[in-house]
Amino acid sequence: MSKKRLYEIAKELGKESKEVVARAKELGLDVKSHSSSVEEAVAAKIAASFKPAAAPKVEAKPAAPKVSAEKKTEKSEPAKPAVAKEEAKPAEPVAPKTEKVAAKPQSRNFKAEREARAKEQAERRKQNKGNNRDQQQNGNRQKNDGRNGGKQGQSNRDNRRFNDQAKKQQGQQKRRNERRQQEDKRSNQAAPRIDFKARAAALKAEQNAEYARSSEERFKQYQAAKEALAQANKRKEPEEIFEEAAKLAEQAQQVQAVVEVVPEKKEPAVDTRRKKQARPDKNRDDYDHEEDGPRKQQKNRSSQNQVRNQKNSNWNNNKKNKKGNNKNNRNQTPKPVTERKFHELPTEFEYTDGMTVAEIAKRIKREPAEIVKKLFMMGVMATQNQSLDGETIELLMVDYGIEAKQKVEVDNADIERFFVEDGYLNEDELVERPPVVTIMGHVDHGKTTLLDTLRNSRVATGEAGGITQHIGAYQIVENGKKITFLDTPGHAAFTSMRARGASVTDITILVVAADDGVMPQTIEAINHSKAANVPIIVAINKIDKPGANPERVIGELAEHGVMSTAWGGDSEFVEISAKFNQNIEELLETVLLVAEIQELKADPTVRAIGTVIEARLDKGKGAVATLLVQQGTLNVQDPIVVGNTFGRVRAMTNDLGRRVKVAGPSTPVSITGLNEAPMAGDHFAVYEDEKSARAAGEERAKRALMKQRQATQRVSLENLFDTLKAGELKSVNVIIKADVQGSVEALSASLQKIDVEGVKVTIVHSAVGAINESDVTLAEASNAFIVGFNVRPTPQARQQAEADDVEIRLHSIIYKVIEEMEEAMKGMLDPEFEEKVIGEAVIRETFKVSKVGTIGGFMVINGKVARDSKVRVIRDGVVIYDGELASLKHYKDDVKEVTNGREGGLMIDGYNDIKMDDVIEAYVMEEIKR
């Protein structure tokens, strides 16, 4: 069987869905909402419960015999009274509900009533057919019962089922009759419907008629007054007419003034529609006798009335009239002139550079025009939106008699201010702090051995277990005093820290082997220490060896500016043996003595500041940074800004790997809790709260990103004159590397003699040998050139120079170096060509051919070697020969070039001293486009 939803039933019956849902629940059906579906028979049952509302005039007489029949069946079947009562229950609460509804006047839905009547007739026919069918089945059952004879129990069940169906049908018919009777009562009691549209139309017609009558009366009155005035004017003289017109004008003005003063009383019913009124200033002409006259005249009058009604309309009475000569505003009293309030000038004025005239006027409560006038009298042409410098603002305040003070703006993201501010430290709270010592020197001179000896034999007393975690720095105790050693051996880390402005080292221990003497890296370490302005303690190591000569070491160091105190210098010399732990105590005592002379002090009461020694990313801990506290005390949970990152100190460990909660001045600790790993050499500072630390860290990261995007403008020979002219450079720093010591001395002396406009050349470092990575690092830190005289940079140094944007100039004639430097400083440098290295090759084998010369078998290791390129022969980093190729072959074929990874043979024009492992550098001269 098909199903129906409750809202479909409601639509068919013309009822609301909620009424149908309520009725279904009253009938005992399990429904939840209007979208619930029921069987077709149940739907018919629900529709039948609403049928009396759709059939107002149905006789209820046939219900009487069925009720009696129902009673008879109840009497004849005493075993079924409960079932009949249950079937009749749903109809009992319906009657009172329909009586309540009948009291309300409702509009009838004739379509729904017709559909309901049609369905009722169809159901009635269906029920009649069902009754006939039941009677036939009953007769068949009786025949079967007669045939079967012995099946008495089955016939009883069939009889009961038949009686139940009859009772059910009788109950339904009874309920239908009751609903029909109630609907008849409702239709008789229903009040007559009110047609609101008809009432509105009648009211409108009445208003239009009233409006037409009033308009006609006004027009007749106007015409009568006009005719009377015309008759009176005919009898009067012209002078009297003029006098009367003047009197009428005066009366009209008086009436208008009264109307303006006395507000009009609003009538209760105002018709805001456009009214057709006769114009008082023109005579109306009747053109009714003409065919087209009235229609045209009516059109013109309506257009004129539209304009007049727009002017006289009362739609927006509150809108101000823009015209000053309006009649309504003519007799109003003028507004009083507002007097300007006098504001006293402030006694003090706090200003910042770049304040505009309008801002100053607002602060001192004066008009901008007044300040512009004063500035004009002072000889300064300015507008109210123009910025003024500090001097002009101070002069302006003097003219007003106000004391001007410049506002000092504090940059919260600037960590460096904590290191330079005098008021940050409390002079009364300063205490002595341990010195920070860095050990430097040549790799093979026992520097690592000295570090191991100090670490293993001088660990802080009371600490058991030794060093369990290497964090880049450690402390030892000597004579009850602590000494902090930075585990940053070598000059590279020291220079990179100095390049970032982190001079955390107080003392440098320079380790020199007594048997080797001064080596190139020793000289570089001396230059780094002098550049950082750090005192040097020389430790002459390996004095236990047979070939040790300490006196020779002292003499060699004196040549490089490191003088012993015995010779009248300021550097302490100690002879030690790190391997046999000889004179180590004397070295530590010397360190404490130098530290005492320096008077190293710190304030442990302020918030901690310091420097990053090293940083890394740990898989389990995240960003881990080793910090050296320089001032103040660092605590766990302190909000901290480190370089361009920020965070909170989550955990803190000392050099022994043990957890600590407090770290004082000159104490190295490893911390976790940063959101990113900082750079070595960055400064750190503790802030008041996490909010300010976060703001400072984010601002520093933003500035670093902007700085990184901007191209770094380093000094070069091309922009040297502009830099000097702008006053940005007072001296030119140069690093000299040459093939022999004589060339180094000659070139240094020649460059130092150049003096242009008070600018001198400063030789930062000079040495013999190829240009290495240390030279590039030093040049990057010192913002210097590198001048190579008959030497070449190593591949690693060349890559680092390109990365750090350090300029390397290579020359073979000394006077060209001097001329180029002079022309650069005088602004006359105009290079036309630039050298470009196109490839490198290594000689694998040599072949000497009589009457031809030496042929070099080579392999290209980088770039290419071209036939028309120039070549240099480099042996051990020193240029041996510079010339051109005589021939270039690949096997037996002459070729124009040999590319990377291929082999070939070459001959150099005018040079036959080619040896194995010589480097052939191929280069071309390219024109520089300016």
Swiss-Prot record:
BP GO annotations: translational initiation
Pfam families to which the protein is assigned, alphabetical: EF-G_D2, GTP_EFTU, IF-2, IF2_N
Region (G1): 441-448
Predominant place of localization: cytoplasm
Metal-binding is among the record's keywords: no
Function: One of the essential components for the initiation of protein synthesis. Protects formylmethionyl-tRNA from spontaneous hydrolysis and promotes its binding to the 30S ribosomal subunits. Also involved in the hydrolysis of GTP during the formation of the 70S ribosomal complex.
Protein name, UniProt field: Translation initiation factor IF-2
Organism: Streptococcus pneumoniae (strain ATCC BAA-255 / R6)
